[in-house]
Amino acid sequence: MGNTVTCCVSPDASPKAGRDRAVTERGEPYQAQVELQETDPGPHLQHISDREFPVDFHDEPNPSDHPQASTIFLSKSQTDVREKRKSNHINHVSPGQLTKKYSSCSTIFLDDSTVSQPNLRSTIKCVTLAIYYHIKNRDSDRSLEIFDEKLHPLTREEVADDYCKHDPDHKHIYRFVRTLFSAAQLTAECAIVTLVYLERLLTYAEIDICPSNWKRIVLGAILLASKVWDDQAVWNVDYCQILKDITVEDMNEMERHFLELLQFNINVPASVYAKYYFDLRSLADDNNLSFLLEPLSKERAQKLEAISRLCEDKYKDLSKAAMRRSISADNLVGIRRSNAIIS
């Protein structure tokens, strides 16, 4: 009845499985600063906000972890975009924006790609273009042995000695990724998560994606994203059947190294996912990879409304499941009593 607030926690209670996985991290054990109390012999559970971070962590946040940070691929592409605009201005070349369709009061042009259901073909094009800019505008050629295609070839064909000197073009990267996504029947959301894991690997491991390692890095990111995102994940042996010449042992070893370099951080917040989606759309606009626009018809409007209602109902169900109902002491007078039946 006073102003004292108490909280009862069973000393035998164990954290939830999902929370335990979220705070598990490979590396040196975290030394939590705990003030031991004689009256509280229960175990201390580390909260995710209690983690220790580097001194410059908040100065340069990782874009794959924080929605406020700008994506790496978009910043690397700005140099080429500015050069293209400058060249078009000097040569009096139209950038192609005159053919773009704009909405009016009577007609609305929309594409079939949304943040919840992106277009597969357009998304793969944008993701591979982002990988292309990563390779082209890399700072150096830092790499690791596990990703070196010369030491771990994906095919039986001998890798040329000057393989690391020739940057792959966008079409080459697109064909490689499209083959994997088509054979494994992966979704467009998986492609976006693949790019998140790729940039997280480059940041955490402090390496660069270059001609000698890009295929194995992309393959490892796709492998991990397909297992995390899709309900029916593709097995490692399935990728071996797609690529033919790679062994299961090599796939397992690469996956293990990939997870260790990510410090087992495979979480992708919704805000980070949305940021990557819209930055990919910006990348497409800057490089004239426009999405297919069609006039909004009555049928398409009803379809979009149905998709919106489906997502809204889904989020409502999740919020209701997570909601905890409680009754305060102020409403004790208004509690309804069950009606008694007198026979």
From Swiss-Prot:
InterPro entries in UniProt: Cyclin-like_dom (IPR013763), Cyclin-like_sf (IPR036915), Cyclin_N (IPR006671), Cyclin_Y (IPR012399)
Domain Cyclin N-terminal intervals: 145-267
Signal peptide start-end: none
Main location: membrane
Cysteines paired by S-S bonds: none
Pfam families for this protein: Cyclin_N (PF00134)
UniProt keyword Membrane present: yes
An annotated Gene Ontology molecular function: protein kinase binding
Keywords, ordered alphabetically: Cell membrane, Cyclin, Membrane, Neurogenesis
Compartments (UniProt record): Cell membrane
Cellular component terms per the entry's GO annotation: plasma membrane
Classification via SUPFAM superfamilies: Cyclin-like
GO terms (BP aspect): nervous system development
Keyword Transcription regulation found: no
Comp. bias intervals (Basic and acidic residues): 17-28
Family that this chain belongs to: Belongs to the cyclin family. Cyclin Y subfamily.
Primary role: Key regulator of Wnt signaling implicated in various biological processes, such as embryonic neurogenesis.
Protein name in UniProt: Cyclin-Y-like protein 1
